[in-house]
Regions:
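Hydrophobic alpha-helical segments
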Residues: 1-226
């Protein structure tokens, strides 16, 4: 694995680093290396933690597991393997059914997903694209199923992970073993990857799978080459 652009600090380097580590040990079962990288500038790490807590707070029908599923789809759309693995790990810990995680790219047709799920995921994936892909039709379907506050929660997850996607892909953050195991379990069962290939950014087969899934859901207007 390539050396990250900036090496993460040790969890015991400061009192604040230890406190943040304790929080993530509870939510993920480990502390992400990305947090220890942010700790080179503690205000950034603190602001991120507060934003994370605010975004993941549930005030409506969007559950904790749904938010992690949104994060998974958003991160896979943008191509961030690190965040994708973390989202799968968190979705498992917050109660996402295995059936949903295994079939999430077929959410348009799979019986594990409701019409409101489909509207939610359409919005999340379209919002994750650059240029932005949120159409008037996608907006109308989202408004049909969700309140303004719930739409804010959905897009809050997309925006939060947009920051993380760019941070971790640019930093080359080293993926932690628990996250690797969670993600490989899901994608290996779908025969999308073989062991040890998931987080190789040059994995053309995986990127092709993403492209095909998005095209099948008619969320890309044109083919996208990888």
């Amino acid at each position: 694995m390539k050396k990250p652009l900036v090496s993460p600090l040790d969890r015991n380097s400061t009192k604040q680093a230890r406190e943040m580590a304790d929080f993530y040990d509870e939510t993920l079962g480990f502390t992400p290396n990305s947090l220890f990288t942010m700790m080179h500038r503690p205000r950034i790490a603190k602001a991120f933690l507060e934003m994370n807590q605010a975004v993941m707070e549930n005030k409506g029908s969007i559950t904790s597991s749904m938010k992690r599923e949104i994060a998974y789809l958003s991160s896979m759309t943008t191509g961030c393997r690190y965040c994708e693995a973390h989202a799968i790990r968190a979705a498992e810990r917050y109660g996402s059914l295995q059936e949903r995680l295994e079939n999430i790219w077929e959410y348009k047709s799979n019986a594990a997903f409701s019409e409101s799920d489909r509207a939610m995921f359409d919005l999340a994936i379209a919002a994750s694209q650059v240029p932005n892909g949120v159409s008037e039709e996608i907006k109308a379907r989202a408004k049909k199923f969700f309140s303004d506050g719930e739409i804010v929660e959905i897009l809050g997850v997309v925006a939060l992970f947009g920051y993380l996607n760019r941070w971790n892909d640019s930093m080359g953050t080293e993926l932690e073993n628990p996250a690797v195991k969670s993600a490989e379990k899901i994608l290996k069962e779908r025969n999308i990857i073989s062991e040890g290939t998931l987080y190789d950014i040059s994995n053309v087969a995986l990127l092709h799978h993403i492209n095909q899934a998005l095209r099948a859901n008619k969320l890309f207007e044109k083919d996208r080459d990888y």
